[in-house]
């Protein structure tokens, strides 16, 4: 079933919904970010990963500074319409540390 942006429940978490970013080819989870309605509209319009930066309090496109962009192949919405997956083709590392994925640390036992 296809959903519209207006069906996404942005109000449940104060205007933001989590976005899991996953490599469309390898299926590796690259990162977790957040989107608001405006950044999701930009992602749909441009085909690039757009997010809302909670730390900088502004819109940002992945790769706008690093060049490591993510081309969106598909956007999936969960059953409650309060979480999203971007299936992407990354052009470089997803993590600002230079790692391919942001989930490269293990929690101590």
Where are these regions (language model features)?
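C-terminal binding/interaction regions
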Residues: 2-16, 22-30, 35-109
């Amino acid at each position: 079933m296809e959903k519209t942006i207006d069906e996404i429940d942005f109000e449940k978490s104060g205007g933001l919904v989590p976005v899991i970013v996953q490599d469309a080819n390898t299926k590796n989870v690259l990162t977790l970010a957040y989107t608001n309605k405006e950044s999701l509209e930009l992602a749909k319009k441009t085909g690039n990963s757009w997010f809302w930066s909670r730390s900088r309090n502004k819109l940002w496109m992945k790769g706008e500074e690093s060049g490591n962009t993510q081309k969106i192949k598909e956007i999936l919405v969960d059953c409650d319409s309060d979480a999203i997956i971007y299936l992407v083709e990354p052009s470089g590392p997803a993590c600002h540390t230079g790692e391919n994925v942001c989930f490269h640390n293990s929690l101590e036992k």
